């Protein structure tokens, strides 16, 4: 199955299920088909993977899954088994979500700063795949961007082991040259020459603000080569946690992917962006270097505040 859609995979405020349903509806409207649930702030997916969600949360999740199914959107779950001794708890968590209709699971080993071992990770991954042969799994390595390879000797050794030993038929996530890449195309995979393009799933953090909360990247996907996203079996855009912005991003993604004739300005107006701010919208595009005059700064301040 070709998966194109979004990731709820950022640090920060977790949206409500009603807000998630709106994202699902927008994905469906644009012919996009995938929503990965993997918020960093959900402790039951990461640090406390051995503890179940509450019954009330699970009821809301069941309703969310039913809505997604009605909209022909698949929901995947991202699980981060930080501790090796939690493999049985991980299996139990997967079984619980599988019983609720989830077929796609991402096993995430990102953002681990110490005591990480590729061979321990792949052992866990294989154990999970062996346990659930009828489900779909992919993998996120600890080194998931080009800039992380040379972070230190441990990261260098990890990437060497990953490059040599990760099964070539399996799918894994990559964010490009940077954790937040401002250019995305075939050159974003230059460190992955030994892997097929279809094995490299993209986790696109361009719009994500959790690691840089005072900065918002916004453009009509002009950082992304259309032939690149179209060549992918899995391309997911990470959202921001800001509901209006996230709905705007989904609208832009759908229009860009389908190459619709809808203009950037039309989409911005549809989502209630002030016409005066649209005149200055390139301020949010990192490719465009803008030197603001004082009167422009004053104008933007009046619009925003």
Model-assigned labels for residue ranges:
Residues 1-86, 100-103:
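Feature activates predominantly on carbohydrate-active enzymes
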Residues 9, 93, 103, 112-257:
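Catalytic-core regions of glycoside hydrolase
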Residues 20, 24-25, 61-66, 90-95, ...:
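Generic structural signal for well-ordered alpha-helices
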Residues 27, 97, 107, 128, ...:
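Conserved, mostly hydrophobic/aromatic
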Residues 28, 65, 69, 98, ...:
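N-terminal cationic-hydrophobic initiation segments that often serve targeting/anchoring roles
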Residues 39, 109, 239:
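Residues that line or immediately flank small-molecule/substrate-binding pockets and catalytic motifs
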Residues 74-116, 219-222:
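Active-site-adjacent "subsite" loops/lids of carbohydrate-active enzymes
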């Amino acid at each position: 199955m070709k998966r194109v859609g979004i990731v709820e995979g950022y640090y920060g405020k977790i949206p409500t299920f009603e807000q998630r349903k709106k994202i699902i509806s927008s994905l469906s409207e644009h012919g996009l088909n995938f929503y990965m649930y993997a918020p960093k702030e959900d402790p039951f997916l990461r640090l406390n993977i051995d503890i179940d969600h509450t019954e009330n949360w699970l009821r809301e999740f069941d309703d969310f899954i039913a809505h997604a199914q009605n909209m022909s959107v698949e929901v995947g779950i991202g699980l981060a088994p930080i501790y090796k001794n939690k493999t049985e708890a991980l299996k139990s968590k997967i079984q619980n979500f599988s019983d609720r209709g989830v077929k796609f699971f991402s096993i995430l080993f990102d953002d681990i700063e110490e005591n990480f071992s590729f061979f321990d990770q792949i052992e866990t991954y294989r154990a999970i795949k062996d346990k659930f042969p009828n489900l779909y799994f992919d993998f996120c390595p600890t080194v998931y961007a080009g800039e992380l390879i040379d972070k230190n000797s441990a990261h260098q050794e990890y990437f060497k082991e990953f490059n040599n030993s990760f099964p070539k038929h399996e799918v894994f996530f990559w964010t490009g040259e940077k954790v937040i890449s401002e250019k995305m195309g075939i050159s974003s995979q230059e460190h992955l020459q030994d892997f097929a393009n279809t094995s490299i799933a993209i986790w696109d953090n361009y719009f994500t603000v959790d690691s840089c909360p005072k900065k918002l990247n916004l453009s009509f996907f002009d950082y992304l080569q259309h032939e690149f996203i179209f060549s992918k079996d899995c391309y997911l855009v990470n959202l921001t946690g800001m509901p209006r912005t996230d709905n705007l991003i989904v609208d832009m993604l759908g229009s860009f992917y389908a190459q619709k004739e809808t203009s950037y300005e039309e989409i911005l107006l549809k989502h209630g962006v002030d016409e005066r701010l649209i005149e200055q919208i390139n301020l949010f595009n990192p490719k465009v270097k803008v030197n603001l005059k004082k009167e422009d700064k004053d104008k933007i301040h009046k619009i925003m505040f």
